Amino acid sequence: MLLVVSPAKKLDFESPLATEKFSQPGLLEQSQLLIDDCIKLSPSEIASLMKLSDKLAGLNAARFGQWSTPFTQDNARQAILSFNGDVYTGLDAQSFSDEDFEFAQKNFRILSGLYGLLKPLDLMQAYRLEMGCKLGNSRGDNLYQFWGEIITDELNKTLSELDDDVLINLASTEYFKSVKKKSLNATIITPTFKDWKNGQYKIISFFAKKARGLMARYIIQNKLTSVEQIKTFDLAGYQYNEAMSKDNDWVFTRKES
């Protein structure tokens, strides 16, 4: 069973590391091509392209300019400990044991606009480049065209190494569009999280994002290997809702948040 999630805009390169173990991203040559395009952009062009404030555009222009290989523990940080958005609040990798990190390294991947696909312990340098960004590049007008089949090929390699054919999609629509479903050698299970509000179950973005992280944490900490075991997920009051689930779209609901 392979899990995929989105990255986060918010980063944390300051807090103490929960592990000293690390690995290297597998697609850095591709990342370098994107960096070569990004460093040509002025802060104002970055602000327009990424819809950022002048301050954030300046910060990210500096990040692109400072990006350099090789990655070391002095100039980079493990991906799973670098992202700090709602999904990662639910995941809470800072509290992982060595066994949790080991399981995650095999069974958990992070989709990325710049790095393509990251293992949890892959070192990364700070960046902002969302998958939906319309960055012109040598392969097209956006990052979906740039990555093409590359991300899917990497996922297929990982699935083959796991000798498994199930992928749990905990990523956003924007990021999962980078995966070519027809080329993926896996059944895709997509969990959805809904909260009771105004007399009906609804997807509430903040809660749904955190729940994706909670589910990843549940799978990792319990070392789940069978997809049916996911239906036992019960963190934060969520429960599998068989009546609302259909085929490979699994719905988890809760009445109180």
Swiss-Prot record:
Domain of life: Bacteria
GO annotation, cellular component aspect: cytosol
A single BP term in Gene Ontology: response to hydroperoxide
InterPro entries registered for this protein in UniProt: YaaA (IPR005583)
Pfam families, per database record: H2O2_YaaD
Homology family: Belongs to the UPF0246 family.
Species name: Colwellia psychrerythraea (strain 34H / ATCC BAA-681)
This protein's name: UPF0246 protein CPS_4102
HAMAP family given in the database record: UPF0246
